[in-house]
Amino acid sequence: MRKFLKYQLDVPSINSEDKNRTVVKIAPLEIGFGDTLGNALRRICLSSIPGASMFAVKFGGYSHEFQPYEGVKEDITHIILNLKNLAIKIDELIYSEDYFNNLLIDKWPKMKINFKGPGVITAKDIVCPVGFEIVNQDLYIAEVTKPIDVEIEIFAKTGRGRVDFNTNKDFVSTLHIIATDSNYSPVLHYAYNVEMIKDSKSSMSEILTIDIATNGTISGSEAIAIAAKIMQAHLEPIVNIDKTINEMIIMREREEEEKRQNASISIDDLDLTVRAYNALKQSGINTTAELIELTKSQLEKIKNLGRKSVTEIIQKLTERSLELKKD
């Protein structure tokens, strides 16, 4: 089986202009694999990367989202819309998935806002329980226009994908707690581009460029790595249908590929002197593949090929990571 060439990853350092954006380049890929990988990673990144999200909120003195908030510029609906933009991190070493699955809403760890107006409420005014963190501290939430106390409790948990309002409403049955829809995905944007690149005179490959942006709770490179891990976990049982397949070597190192390509080129491309070139041609040697089947002593016996020409040929082979057979 002809092996696939191992590709290289170019993951740049954090972008100083936008710390939540990452551009990753993957190359060289065989023709067709740019779209295969780019599209598969895209679907997983946008739908299945785990994260944290608000799923309910409680406003002190208010029972539903369609009420105006006295003394606050925004009504409750608009405040909820702003709160849904919170980039929340939850430490899964403290709060596992099972922890939330078995927890009643009245025992839930809550993020709280206790704000004395007037003034502007931002995410930095949120007090988080241990294990919870708000990444986008500058997020605008509301403007309090009067000297009143604003009390808000925010309920969040880990998950993946999107969960609609009705599903969360079934879970939240406590009076005065308002269910919201949830978007757990930390990936805000994913785009990819595939370009053809020339490896040699006759060989083409692809370069896959992924442009990904997150909400800051994880990096773009982390999101891509998690997506690859999810894909790997789904493919592994299929690979294990035949246990012998696990022992197959699918990829080869770049150096091996270069040697393979160099071993099949014409001696016309070695840029030899006329004397050395003519001597090889007259002896029926036309490619490097034929040349490296010779030992040094066999090469020295070729008619009209002197010691200087032999040294020249060996040097040209070395430049292409090739060598003669051992005597």
UniProtKB/Swiss-Prot annotation:
Residue ranges of the region described as Alpha N-terminal domain (alpha-NTD): 1-242
Membrane-spanning segments: none
CDD domains: RNAP_alpha_NTD
SUPFAM superfamilies the record matches: C-terminal domain of RNA polymerase alpha subunit, Insert subdomain of RNA polymerase alpha subunit, RBP11-like subunits of RNA polymerase
Region (Alpha C-terminal domain (alpha-CTD)): 259-327
UniProt keyword annotations, A-Z: DNA-directed RNA polymerase, Nucleotidyltransferase, Transcription, Transferase
Domains (record comment): The N-terminal domain is essential for RNAP assembly and basal transcription, whereas the C-terminal domain is involved in interaction with transcriptional regulators and with upstream promoter elements.
HAMAP family cross-referenced by the UniProt entry: RNApol_bact_RpoA
Name of this chain's protein: DNA-directed RNA polymerase subunit alpha
